């Protein structure tokens, strides 16, 4: 098996690039990528894509992520974490009540300025390189979403608080920590940071590796996750021989809504159940049973009548991932085509 995901746990003290080198030494010559760089001082989930799974990395980068982080109040560092130099201090330390209550202010859509010590580029140069040289770094604000934020623990003696957050892509926890502290009329920096989840990948079943000698290639592959795992919550269509051939060779491919739709899950609607139809804030849906499997699925009525475009879906051929793309009415537009099977014509 050469196309799969690995749920790797990056330890604190090594870079994401160093962990990539370790995994490459174990697996040998194969295409490898990862979804979402972690700082050297951070630890946690770093999903690895192997082989054709690298074509899906962009989906994981867009996925929600969860973190647990600890803030030290009363000081600010130039990097936003304990690796930097202290550049300011303040005697004002928040109370436990304040540390808990401030969370509600940050839930929702937030504008955040990335830290100077980041991998973002300024005129083609990494921001952290400019910051290390003492140069002024100006980065544009970006819009992010904080889905959840709560205080887990407050240590008055050490002036620290530990928080949990679920957030969108592009969120910098070091900046979030600084903004939390400022909102509490204090200063702060991150002393511990752990990423606990990226999409479907969670820390409780992650593989922990510190050196290439700790695990063999076979043992690592035994812990692999199928390439389709991250696609479980989006629409999937099953292609016939002729449809699969059209997709493989980049030709126009049409699907019949009545015959080809098999699965639709997790539509982002809040629905109110009404008989055998469901009313949504954005669309109507129809409950239908798939006679071939006995399973019940929900189809938007717009899709049922071929009036709705689908931004992202995937196509199977003989049970194996063939392509991902979009659907414009009944026409499939391929974004990525995968070579996972030799069973082709």
Curated annotation (Swiss-Prot):
Active site residues per record: 39 (nucleophile)
- Reaction it catalyzes: uridine(55) in tRNA = pseudouridine(55) in tRNA
Name the Pfam families for this protein.
TruB_C_2, TruB_N
**GO biological process, alphabetically ordered:** mRNA pseudouridine synthesis; tRNA pseudouridine synthesis
EC no.?
5.4.99.25
Keyword NADP in annotation:
no
Which InterPro entries did the record assign? PsdUridine_synth_cat_dom_sf (IPR020103), PsdUridine_synth_N (IPR002501), RPE1 (IPR005728), tRNA_psdUridine_synth_TruB (IPR014780), TruB_C (IPR032819)
Gene3D superfamilies in the record? Pseudouridine synthase
Query: Recorded GO terms, molecular function?
Result: RNA binding; tRNA pseudouridine(55) synthase activity
Query: Which keywords belong to this entry?
Result: Isomerase, tRNA processing
What does this chain do?
Responsible for synthesis of pseudouridine from uracil-55 in the psi GC loop of transfer RNAs.
| Homology family | Belongs to the pseudouridine synthase TruB family. Type 1 subfamily.
Instruction: Give the protein name, as stated in the record.
Output: tRNA pseudouridine synthase B
């Amino acid at each position: 098996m050469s196309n799969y995901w690995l749920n790797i746990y990056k330890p604190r003290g090594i870079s994401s690039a160093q962990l990539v080198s370790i995994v490459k030494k174990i697996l040998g010559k194969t295409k490898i990528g990862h979804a979402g760089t972690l700082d050297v001082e951070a630890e946690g989930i770093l999903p690895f894509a192997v082989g054709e799974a690298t074509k899906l990395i962009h989906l994981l980068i867009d996925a929600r992520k969860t973190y647990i982080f600890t803030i030290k109040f009363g000081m600010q560092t130039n990097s936003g974490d304990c690796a930097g130099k202290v550049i300011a201090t303040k005697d004002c330390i928040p109370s436990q009540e304040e540390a808990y209550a401030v969370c509600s202010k940050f839930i929702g859509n937030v504008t955040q300025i990335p830290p100077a010590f980041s991998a973002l580029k300024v005129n083609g140069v990494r921001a952290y390189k400019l910051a290390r040289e003492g140069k002024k770094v100006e980065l544009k604000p970006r819009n992010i979403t904080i889905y959840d934020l709560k205080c887990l623990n407050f240590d008055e003696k050490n002036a620290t608080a530990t928080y949990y957050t679920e957030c969108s892509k592009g969120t910098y926890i070091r900046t979030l920590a600084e903004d939390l502290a400022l909102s509490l009329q204090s200063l702060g920096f991150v002393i511990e940071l752990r990423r606990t989840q990226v999409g479907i990948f969670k820390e409780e079943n992650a593989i922990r590796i510190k050196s290439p000698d700790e695990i063999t290639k076979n043992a690592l592959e035994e812990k692999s996750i199928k390439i389709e795992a991250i696609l479980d919550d989006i629409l999937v269509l099953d292609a016939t021989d002729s449809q699969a051939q059209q997709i493989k060779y980049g030709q126009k491919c049409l699907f019949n809504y009545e015959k080809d739709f098999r699965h639709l899950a997790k539509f982002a609607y809040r629905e109110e159940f009404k008989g055998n139809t469901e009313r949504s804030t954005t669309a109507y849906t129809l409950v239908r049973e798939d006679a071939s499997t006995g399973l019940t699925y929900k189809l938007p009525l717009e899709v049922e009548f071929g009036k709705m475009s689908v931004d992202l879906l995937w196509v199977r051929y003989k049970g194996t991932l063939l392509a991902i793309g979009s659907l414009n009415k009944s026409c499939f537009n391929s974004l990525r085509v995968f070579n996972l099977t030799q069973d082709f014509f």
